[in-house]
């Protein structure tokens, strides 16, 4: 069960930022003129899509969580995410290391020990952000995830449609896309 929890946390944290060029993901677009200072603050994980078998099995049991993005001393970002686990609130922090391109970050997966790249594909900074994450869990097992971050717990229908369209362009099918249900549990820590 701890491994499943770590995977869920990794999935949430994966989705949070950046754009790194990798051989496999060279076609991933990114937010032009990304402004890290505008990206800081509170975000709700509102939508996810992933090729992970664990995600596909557990997606209906997941609920919205909250993340706070803050600058790190190294010029990257500290991503602190609070979520409900076994009827208790749990908080984890992940260091997103900056790449050469603004908005590009990478991190080491606490579950797999591998490096994952994160792209901020699109954001208006005030309402939503679309993110894409890619990495390798183990030899021959590539990991991909699309994430919708929202500044509120109730993203507009147009934003949700934008996320669905984006996820489908990255190869996710309709059944691999989930919008996480709103919850009040574990949200008060970051209000």
From Swiss-Prot:
Residues at the catalytic site: 65 (nucleophile)
Residue positions with a glycan: 51, 78
Keywords recorded for this protein, A-Z: Cytoplasm, Disulfide bond, Endoplasmic reticulum, Fatty acid biosynthesis, Fatty acid metabolism, Glycoprotein, Golgi apparatus, Isomerase, Lipid biosynthesis, Lipid metabolism, Mast cell degranulation, Membrane, Nucleus, Prostaglandin biosynthesis, Prostaglandin metabolism, Pyrrolidone carboxylic acid, Secreted, Signal, Transport
Domain notes: Forms a beta-barrel structure that accommodates hydrophobic ligands in its interior.
PANTHER family, sorted: LIPOCALIN, PROSTAGLANDIN-H2 D-ISOMERASE
GO CC, alphabetical: extracellular region; extracellular space; Golgi apparatus; nuclear membrane; perinuclear region of cytoplasm; rough endoplasmic reticulum
Gene3D superfamilies, sorted: 2.40.128.20
Species of the source: Felis catus (Cat)
Chief site of localization: endoplasmic reticulum
InterPro entries in alphabetical order: Calycin (IPR012674), Lipocalin (IPR002345), Lipocln_cytosolic_FA-bd_dom (IPR000566)
Reaction catalyzed: prostaglandin H2 = prostaglandin D2
Protein name: Prostaglandin-H2 D-isomerase
GO terms, biological process: mast cell degranulation; prostaglandin biosynthetic process; regulation of circadian sleep/wake cycle, sleep
Processing and modification events after translation: N- and O-glycosylated. Both N-glycosylation recognition sites are almost quantitatively occupied by N-glycans of the biantennary complex type, with a considerable proportion of structures bearing a bisecting GlcNAc. N-glycan at Asn-78: dHex1Hex5HexNAc4. Agalacto structure as well as sialylated and nonsialylated oligosaccharides bearing alpha2-3- and/or alpha2-6-linked NeuNAc are present.
Molecular function per GO: prostaglandin-D synthase activity; retinoid binding; small molecule binding
Organism placement in taxonomy: Eukaryota, Metazoa, Chordata, Craniata, Vertebrata
Disulfide bonds: 89-186
Top-level taxonomic group: Eukaryota
Extent of the signal sequence: 1-24
Biological role stated in the UniProt entry: Catalyzes the conversion of PGH2 to PGD2, a prostaglandin involved in smooth muscle contraction/relaxation and a potent inhibitor of platelet aggregation. Involved in a variety of CNS functions, such as sedation, NREM sleep and PGE2-induced allodynia, and may have an anti-apoptotic role in oligodendrocytes. Binds small non-substrate lipophilic molecules, including biliverdin, bilirubin, retinal, retinoic acid and thyroid hormone, and may act as a scavenger for harmful hydrophobic molecules and as a secretory retinoid and thyroid hormone transporter.
Similarity comment: Belongs to the calycin superfamily. Lipocalin family.
In-chain residues carrying the UniProt-annotated modification Pyrrolidone carboxylic acid: 25
EC number, UniProt record: 5.3.99.2
Classification via SUPFAM superfamilies: Lipocalins
């Amino acid at each position: 069960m701890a491994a499943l929890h770590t995977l869920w946390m990794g999935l949430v944290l994966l989705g949070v930022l950046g754009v790194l060029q990798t051989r496999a993901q060279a076609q991933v677009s990114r937010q032009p003129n990304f402004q890290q200072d505008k990206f800081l603050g509170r975000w709700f994980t509102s939508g996810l899509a992933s090729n992970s078998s664990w995600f596909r099995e557990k997606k209906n049991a997941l609920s919205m969580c909250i993340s706070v993005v803050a600058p790190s001393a190294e010029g990257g970002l500290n991503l602190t995410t609070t979520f409900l686990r076994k009827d208790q609130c749990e908080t984890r922090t992940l260091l997103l290391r900056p790449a050469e391109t603004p908005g590009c970050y990478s991190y080491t997966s606490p579950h797999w020990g591998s490096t994952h790249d994160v792209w901020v594909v699109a954001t208006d900074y005030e309402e939503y952000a679309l993110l894409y994450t890619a990495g390798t869990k183990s030899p021959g097992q590539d990991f991909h995830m699309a994430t919708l971050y929202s500044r509120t717990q109730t993203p507009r229908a147009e934003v949700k449609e934008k996320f669905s369209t984006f996820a489908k362009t990255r190869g996710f099918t309709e059944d691999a896309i989930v919008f996480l249900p709103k919850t009040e549990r574990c949200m008060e820590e970051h209000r």
